[in-house]
Amino acid sequence: MTVHVIYGSDSGRTEAAAGKIAAKLDARLIDVKDATVADFEDCDLLVLGSPTYGEGDLQMDWEAGVDLLAEAELTGKRVALFGLGDQTNYPESFADALGKLYDAVTAKGAEIVGFTDTKGYEFDVSAAVRGGRFVGLVLDQDGQAGKSEKRIASWISQIL
C-alpha cells in the first residue's frame, strides 16, 4: 500500500508528528509547501496534517495546499487527518484546522478514515468535531504531549 503523509509546520512539532506517523506507516513524507497535485492523488492512503494557529487557522503553507487539493481527484480516496492544537489556550477553536482540511477533502469526494474520540480532551468548541467525534487524530503537544505516542499508535491501527 502506498501512503503519503503531507503536512504543514512552522515550529517543527507537526513535522515531528508527521515523521513519526510516516515511519510507522512506511510512508513518503512530504512538506505541503513542496507538494504537487500528484502527491495528493498517487497513493492508496493520503494522510494530511496541520497545526491550528490563532483562532482556528490552518498553517500558512496549507493556503496553497488547499488550492492543490481543489485541483486533485480525490473521489473515493482514503484520507486520514491529523492535527495539533492547544486546548488550554484555545478552547474555543481547538484543532479547528483539522475541520478545515476535512471540509476540503470531503468536498472532493474523499473517504475519511480515522475518526477519534473526544474523551480525554477539555475544550469548549472545535470545528474538528463531527457527529461527536474528531474527524482525525488530535494531538495537544502543549498540554498532553505525554499521550501523543499512544494516541498515534492507536490511530494508525485504525486507519490501516
Q: What annotation goes with each model-predicted range?
A:
Residues 27-37:
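A short beta-strand-loop structural module common to alpha/beta enzyme folds
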Residues 16, 24, 28, 42-160:
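FMN-binding flavodoxin-like domain, especially the glycine-rich phosphate-binding loop
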